[in-house]
Curated annotation (Swiss-Prot):
A Pfam family per the record: Trp_syntA
Protein name per Swiss-Prot or TrEMBL: Tryptophan synthase alpha chain
Residue numbers annotated as active site: E49, D60
Main function: The alpha subunit is responsible for the aldol cleavage of indoleglycerol phosphate to indole and glyceraldehyde 3-phosphate.
Amino acid sequence: MSRLEQRFAELKAEGRSALVTFVTAGDPGYDASLQILKGLPAAGADVIELGMPFTDPMADGVAIQLATLRALEAGQNLAKTLQMVREFRVDNQATPIVLMGYYNPIHRFGVEKFVAEAKEAGVDGLIIVDLPPEHDAELATPAQAAGIDFIRLTTPTTDDARLPRVLERSSGFVYYVSVAGVTGAGSATTEHVTEAIARLRRHTDLPISVGFGIRTPEQAAAIARLADGVVVGSALVDKIAQAKDADQAVADVLSLCSALAEGVRGARR
């Protein structure tokens, strides 16, 4: 059983949803970013998505684009992101880490080398936003062969004809993007999310995590009553943008994570 399967199975047994947190690797700098990464599990993160900075983050909203820019300006690259996971794994073997981003940096790094190093570093899954199932052979197939889950994004515009193709080779969990568009955009209604989850469940047994537009503990709790996982990214990244220095960035991200975790954990009581 993979770390992701195990985590979702444990939480299902506990009768609660997972808090899935997204931060960009290297934002606001390597050391502070590593501190955030190491602090997230104790602050209540059940799964961590770590963004791989790329110069053209087309699916991301302003908050994550700016985070990417800060990270790149601080010298972050894919090798350093993998090193960050290695350093995280020294103290934490339990929390799943999913790398999220675009195919270009992986292609430049070399797919075979990337898959081998990601596996060795302790990466559990990949979300590659610009690689549709038609390109499985390029990365999804070798990643899954190495035991790394390949997590698919589905959206309100993924129709019933397309959905089975998208979900066919998915593993780990399904990431439902509750608002069509870029990250951090407005939030979806619970009615819409309820319908979307019911539709996805007709096509897959994988856990379903819902993200995009979730910013507060109250919103997180509302989604936690419906989905297997609640993904929060832009709200955490905004804390880094607003902080006066790296120490405040670390403290504020972890503080918001704790509040979100409280919302998620209390949702089904």
